[in-house]
């Protein structure tokens, strides 16, 4: 059963698996189902059944994981840290390729959940490295979009006396997309019907699936504890978001 922490089911041939996320299961299967909070899973080697918190049987979507050119193998590197440092430029190139239309010379954010002209405040929320990327992005947003910005450590966000406003944009930054405090802050925002955006590395994660809008950082698996390429990806995606919002608001041309 899932309560708080993430949980996923992987499907195999005459065997099924439980794991925290797609990275934990990807070496065994590319077919997975994510449980929502309160879901119950009855698992055997050839059968998987799901129930909600009221013990009613439910159907869950089976996702097919895409092939990822990034692997959890060290390759020729002595450790994951050096490997991931050397992959930083790949993350930057992938982000630019994904979000920047070179022919039109435009930044494509697809279906953004709120008109940038209508945003009165941006709230950036994260923990650890993600929080530090938010601290830097605050200066960019205020300088280039002329929108006031607040930053919150996710673990503190829920304990403030908050006034939610549907003209505010709440941006949640997380490498894994499963950071417990960040997810709890997002859940509070969803209960108050405000617009949310996730900047994550794992597009199938709880934070990504719960948010109104997702901007993946395309860093691939990051095994090293000290964030390297994921931090670069977060910073770059935040900067592209700043540039696009500035353009739409006619703060820059």
Functional labels for PLM-detected ranges:
Residues 1-116, 130, 139, 143-145, ...:
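N-terminal segments that mediate ammonia production and transfer
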Residues 117-251:
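Glycine-rich phosphate-binding loops that contact phosphosugars or nucleotide phosphates
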């Amino acid at each position: 059963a899932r309560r708080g922490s993430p949980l996923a089911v992987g499907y195999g041939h005459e065997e099924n698996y439980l794991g925290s996320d797609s990275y934990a299961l990807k070496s065994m299967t590319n077919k997975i189902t994510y449980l929502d909070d309160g879901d119950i899973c009855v698992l055997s080697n050839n059968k998987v059944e799901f129930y909600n918190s009221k013990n009613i049987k439910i159907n869950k979507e089976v996702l097919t994981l895409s092939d990822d050119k990034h692997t959890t193998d060290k390759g020729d590197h002595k450790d994951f840290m050096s490997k991931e440092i050397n992959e930083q430029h790949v993350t930057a190139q992938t982000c630019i390729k994904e979000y920047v239309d070179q022919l039109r010379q435009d930044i494509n954010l697809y279906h953004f959940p709120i008109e940038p002209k209508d945003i009165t405040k941006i709230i950036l929320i994260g923990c650890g490295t993600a929080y530090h990327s938010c601290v830097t992005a605050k200066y960019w947003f205020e300088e280039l979009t002329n929108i006031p910005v607040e930053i919150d450590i996710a673990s503190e966000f829920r304990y403030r006396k908050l006034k939610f406003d549907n003209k505010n944009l709440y941006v949640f930054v997380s490498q894994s997309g499963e950071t417990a405090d960040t997810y709890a802050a997002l859940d509070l925002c969803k209960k108050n019907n405000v617009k949310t955006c996730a900047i994550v590395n794992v597009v199938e994660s709880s934070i990504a699936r719960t948010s109104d809008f997702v901007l993946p950082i395309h860093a691939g698996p990051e095994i090293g504890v000290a964030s390297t390429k994921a931090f670069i990806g977060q910073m770059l995606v935040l900067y592209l978001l700043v540039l696009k919002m500035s353009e739409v608001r006619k703060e820059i041309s």
